[in-house]
């Protein structure tokens, strides 16, 4: 994958799911760059995003993604991506100020300390379904 172009979608938005697609950090860079470009032009009507079961996206990839997500995104899936606390902290910080309603991040390698932080955040945000 060298380039990804996201085109304007009308209506309620679209889902972007590439589960178990063998993606790595380089491809995550392409995806996040495309999202940033589309958002800059007001054309990123993304409602659901999942890169679950792509263990090569690494924590730097997660860092790029959380910077590229549009404000209207409602669902996030990063299940079984072999993510550790560094990526988890990035997700946590994003969740604190986002309007996400469903987040599925189970099957990663988060410490018990970070898991407790996620559980407290889930209690503070009753509109958030958080699967850890």
Spans of model-derived segments:
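Leucine-rich tandem repeat or coiled-coil scaffolds
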Residues: 1-132
């Amino acid at each position: 994958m060298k380039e990804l172009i996201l085109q304007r979608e009308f209506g309620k938005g679209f889902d972007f799911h590439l589960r178990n697609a063998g993606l790595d950090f380089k491809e995550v860079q392409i995806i996040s760059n495309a999202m940033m470009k589309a958002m800059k032009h007001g054309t990123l009507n993304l409602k659901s995003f999942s890169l679950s079961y792509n263990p090569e996206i690494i924590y730097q990839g997660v860092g790029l993604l959380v910077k590229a997500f549009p404000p209207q995104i409602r669902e996030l899936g990063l299940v079984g991506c072999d993510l550790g606390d560094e990526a988890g902290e990035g997700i946590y910080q994003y969740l604190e100020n986002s309007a996400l309603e469903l987040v599925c991040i189970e099957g990663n390698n988060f410490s018990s300390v970070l898991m407790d932080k996620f559980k407290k955040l889930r209690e503070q945000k009753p509109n958030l379904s958080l699967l850890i």
